[in-house]
Amino acid sequence: MTKPSLILIGGGGHCKSCIDVIEQENKFLIAGIVDINRFISELLGYPLLGNDDDLAKLKLNYDYALITIGQIKTPAIRIRLLDYAKSLGFKLPAIISPRAYVSKHAKIGNGTIIMHDALINAGVIVGDNCIINTKSLIEHDAVIENNCHISTGAIINGGAIIKQGSFVGSNAATKESIKTNEKDLIKAGSLFKGYANE
């Protein structure tokens, strides 16, 4: 059976990591990359297909896309591109590394990527357009809302709620059952204990 083709929207460093996961998952063929940088012609052997303005034309030939721009300070660009891709009719699949563990009792949203060696336990809900990065741990019953980035080695303990648009830095950890604010930024290496009014 022929694998469907997938367009990657965004051609930076995060895109390289996404390419490796997509190749390992082996469910999609990468058609190429869409990026505003006209100075690149390819990335890891995949061609540049155009920029954001070409997506409507590309939709005539391709059904699937993934947002492959990273997220640190703000999710705004990822959200804008997601909304645009959806408005054109692209399907945005969840991509899960075969080296990750995702419980059969967890739920993963559309357009989310689960990177190598991530661990997602039972009862977890991960929303749409999220990055669950390499070696991160999402413990039982935690909720990661839409458009979040859980960075490399971060630990989200049981029952925690990471509100939409938030970023949890590398090797940061949360206490159990806490709740962040929307678009929160938890610094790398820190322990987030929640807010005083919880």
Q: Can you annotate each of these PLM segments?
A:
Residues 25, 82-85, 148:
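Glycine-rich, phosphate-binding/catalytic loops in enzymes
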Residues 1-43, 56-59:
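Hydrophobic, well-ordered beta-alpha structural blocks that scaffold small-molecule cofactor pockets
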